[in-house]
Structure formats: C-alpha cells, structure tokens
Amino acid sequence: MSSSPRLVLIDGNNQMYRAYHAIRDLTGPDGRSTNAVYGFITMLRKLISDHQPERMAAAFDLRGPTFRNQLDDEYKANRRPMPEDLVEQIEGVHEACRALGVPIVTHQGFEADDVIGTLATRAAATGLDVVIVTGDKDFFQLVNDRIRVFNPRNDGTWYEADRV
C-alpha cells in the first residue's frame, strides 16, 4: 500500500457481535448488559491509537428488509434474531462512535456489508487506501492493491492482495 490518505471502514455489526461474545456478564449499575459497548469502545480506541487513520466510519445494519429479501424470501430466514441484551446496547455503541468522532453510515434497504463495499470501492477508485476492519471473510473479494482487510482479533491479522 502506498502513502496515500487512508480510509478505515469498520464493520460495526461484526465488531459489535465480536465484543458481545468476547466479554460475558458485564453489566452496569442498573443491571443492564454493557459487554458489547465496553468491548467495542476498547477495540475502537485501540484501532485509533495504533493506526491513527485520517478518515474513519463505522457501518451498521438497519432493522428491516433489504433488497436481498425481495430477491429471495429465504434470505437469512434461518438466522437467529439478535439477542435482546445486544439489541439494547446498539445505541450505546453508536454513542461511543459519535463520542470518538467516528461517523456512522447506514442505508435503508442495504446491509452494512453493502455500504462498506460501495464506500471502499469508490474511495479506492479516487486514490484512497482503504482498510476494512472486520472478521468477515466475505470482504476478501474486495482486497486489491488499494483495499486491505484487518481483523483485530487477538493481535490483529492483515489480509492484503498477496494473502487472500
């Protein structure tokens, strides 16, 4: 990758789920779960500190059907719903992003993956280097000389054009 300006795109749902499952039974004084919020903040602060990106955004899914549901009634039909104690933490994760200066991007009718894919390819086409922060291997199809994937799990793994 060159020394071009860099855009970091966070797969918000993926990293929120990761935090939720990595830290169990963490609650606030009111008894409500805070594990996903705490884990997401920790990941985000480390990401900012370690990589000092020039531009950043976090993409999240919105509730409701997407264009894929219109194409296939069975799309994600067997997927379990998001746990209620995680649903209750979504706004806290969004607040953390805003507090740390990370814009949230969403688009009704599209998944966060679609938003990230669009932003990454458009940014790369304008000369920006792009880093997608996710544990989702589906993003490997986007990897090229301008787009890399970073999985922050453990000490972090980089996926570049010569490694996917």
Which residues does each PLM region occupy?
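Noncatalytic, basic helical substrate-engagement surface that gates or grips nucleic-acid strands
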Residues: 2-133, 137-160
